[in-house]
Design a protein with these regions (language model features):
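Protease-associated
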Residues: 1-49, 59-62
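Residue patterns forming the tRNA-binding/recognition surfaces of aminoacyl-tRNA synthetases
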Residues: 30, 46-169
Length: 169
């Protein structure tokens, strides 16, 4: 690689050192949010912070619910109650959702909390329910991308597919 393309480390940071970092996030009613752990993310490699979308991502939804419901989990990772308990899920995308066990002639119901609905449908009760979580994730991501409509932001009212193309321009 040319010299200008080489990364120069400034310092080393462990993933667990990022837990509790106060952040400002767009499109949230909270004045600050905090960096929280997810069991599906390795804290030993690739430390970093990513946006969580618990309305539409089953991994994110169930990680948030685990932290809200389980004081012992919060304690294990040093997560303070006021970092997690006040969080309300902000709906981002509306999708037509039909449970796999619904009668064929039943119309889908519109939801803006697809991750919660999918976790209920596939009986995901924690981040450890990996096979069910994969099913929930496959369904919500497909529905969101191909049939979802954005509820907020500059692309409000656009299909997710169109918004993705619009943002790339």
């Amino acid at each position: 690689l040319p010299e200008f393309a080489k990364a120069i480390p400034v310092c080393k940071v462990r993933g667990r050192d990022l837990v509790g970092l106060p952040l400002k996030a767009p499109l949230t009613s909270l004045p600050r949010i905090y960096s929280l752990p997810m069991l599906t993310i390795s804290m030993k490699k690739g430390t970093g912070i990513v946006t969580s979308v618990p309305s539409d991502a089953p991994d994110d939804y169930i990680a948030l619910m685990d932290l809200k419901r389980k004081p012992a989990l919060r304690e294990k990772y040093g997560v303070k109650d006021d970092w997690v308990l006040p969080i309300e899920i902000i709906p981002i995308i509306t999708v037509p959702y039909k449970r796999d066990d619904s009668p064929e002639d039943q119309d889908p119901e519109m939801t803006d909390l697809a991750a919660q609905v999918a976790c209920d449908e596939f009986k995901v009760s924690s981040q450890n329910d990996k096979p069910q979580l994969l099913l929930a994730k496959a369904k919500t991501y497909k529905l969101g991308f191909y049939e979802g409509t954005l509820k907020i932001g500059d692309c409000k009212g656009m299909s997710v597919q169109d918004a993705k193309a619009h943002v790339k321009m």
